[in-house]
């Protein structure tokens, strides 16, 4: 929805997904033609499942001359293959999971990764820093091709770029340097274990059904309450009023999934919190 409002003159086509949350390759084939500029997927998907058909999607996109872009959660990349390994031309996402605390809608900043080619780099709207070396072997740094940037274009800029974004980028860089490759792997494995535990416990509650099986979920997963006879809004109201718990995101307003809600765990979610949610739902749905 944000893309539709952000990029004037561009048509966004939504492609159907299978019951397990994977992209419907037949539906993708029906919309692909030489007028398609790019195929964009989110991995993990909005519903939390890991898309395992990345290379097939990339091959189909490239066959019609389109680029293949992947919106990837950086917290998952310690345990999930990076987009470049399954054919992505562009990788992008948000750096918020990298040690940045949410604060009144802030704490957000995007990352963008492409091959070092002019067709990509010259379209970057942000500052690009170059390095040069003088005769004495001293290094200097400079802003390269500033006319590309929204900072240079001012009123004609196409996105927000402020000091806070740079500060969040520094925070994310420090977080990554401290964590290192092993730390990011440990982070991903911790989230996977907690997600698996939460799904196992919640799916055992009468009236609760786990959707998009048997796909592996990373952080998010979808719970359906149709069998309980209660709506998501009812469940969320009781969770908040009786147990001081914020319920899952109500998907019934935008997706044909019945009374379903999107839940999420992170590395900071404790087993005690998961058990507390389970007990609360048991009492609400009893």
Regions found by a protein language model. Give the residues of each.
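Conserved PLP-enzyme active-site core in the AAT-like
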Residues: 1-140, 146, 229, 233-238, ...
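Hydrophobic alpha-helical scaffolding
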Residues: 17-22, 44-51, 69-70, 81-82, ...
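Glycine-/acidic-rich phosphate or pyrophosphate-binding loops and their flanking alpha/beta elements
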Residues: 29-30, 54, 151-154, 250
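Active-site C-terminal subdomain of aminotransferase-like
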Residues: 97-206, 210-214
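Conserved C-terminal alpha-helix-loop-beta "cap" of PLP-dependent enzymes
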Residues: 182-276
């Amino acid at each position: 929805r944000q893309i539709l409002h952000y990029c004037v003159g561009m048509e966004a086509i939504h492609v159907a997904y299978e019951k397990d949350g994977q992209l419907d390759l037949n539906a993708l084939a029906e919309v692909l033609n030489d007028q398609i500029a790019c195929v964009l997927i989110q991995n993990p998907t909005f519903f939390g499942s890991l898309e395992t058909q990345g290379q097939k999607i990339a091959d189909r996109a490239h066959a019609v001359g389109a680029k293949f872009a992947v919106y990837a959660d950086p917290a998952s990349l310690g345990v999930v293959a990076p987009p470049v390994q399954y054919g992505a031309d562009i990788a992008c996402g948000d750096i918020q999971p990298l040690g940045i605390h949410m604060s009144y809608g802030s704490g957000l900043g995007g990352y963008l990764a492409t091959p070092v080619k002019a067709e990509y780099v010259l379209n970057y709207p942000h500052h690009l820093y170059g390095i040069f070396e003088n005769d004495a072997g001293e290094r200097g740094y400079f802003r390269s091709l500033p006319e590309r940037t929204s900072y240079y274009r001012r009123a004609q800029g196409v996105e927000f770029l402020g000091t806070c974004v740079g500060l969040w980028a520094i925070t994310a860089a420090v977080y990554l340097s401290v964590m290192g490759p092993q730390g990011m792997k440990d982070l991903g494995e911790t989230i996977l274990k907690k997600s698996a535990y939460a799904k196992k416990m919640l799916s055992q509650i009468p009236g609760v059904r786990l959707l998009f099986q048997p796909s592996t979920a990373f952080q998010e997963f979808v719970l359906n309450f149709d069998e309980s006879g209660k709506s998501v809004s009812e469940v969320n109201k009781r969770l908040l009023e009786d147990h001081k718990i914020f319920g899952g995101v109500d998907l019934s307003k935008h997706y044909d999934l019945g009374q379903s809600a999107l839940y999420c765990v992170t590395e900071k979610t404790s087993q005690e919190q998961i058990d507390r949610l389970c007990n609360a739902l048991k009492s609400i749905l009893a």
